Amino acid sequence: MSADEPMGFREITPPALAPMFGEHPPQSLDKDERYTPAWVFQGLGLVFDLDPASPGEGNGDCVPARRKLTKADDGLAQPWHGLVWLNPPFSNATAWSNRFIEHANGVFLGPIANGRWTHQMMKTADLLWLCRDFAFTHPTHSGKRSSMPLFFAAYGERAAGGLRRLAESARHEGVLVRQEQAAVDQYRRAEHELAEAG
């Protein structure tokens, strides 16, 4: 470990990664009310342009975003712009995650699932796994923990910088994975060729 690496973290680059979990996200809409704790945003040190899955002001929301879309706004159907924060509803993680991958500019917090989108993020985004779970916030049941392992994914230089800051400031041990651009480009070309051959 070099002197530049945060204590308790190790940085690796693919292909040292492999699919890790075969669990599926919970399907109950009741499970969707998980609000990210403030220390995550303090660690990231970013102001986002958009939170497309916001619980709304006064509902335990502490996301530093200039624009927030709630369930009533249907963030999946709206245009996304700039740096995006996404903690998606776990009951529909696939649709939200695919949209985030397509947008490719921002920070994602979600469950590790045995889905194509998880594998795609593992190959194309900078990643951070916190080895211990953490409590989400909620106005009526704060402290609720995820039954799923979670990870952060970042697309874009600003988002990746925020993820590195979070790794340095997190109170938990974890693993930070930084993608090499050449490997990302190669993966995207192969995906495009497969889609065209389809």
PLM features: what roles do these ranges have?
Residues 2-198:
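Class I S-adenosyl-L-methionine-dependent methyltransferase catalytic core
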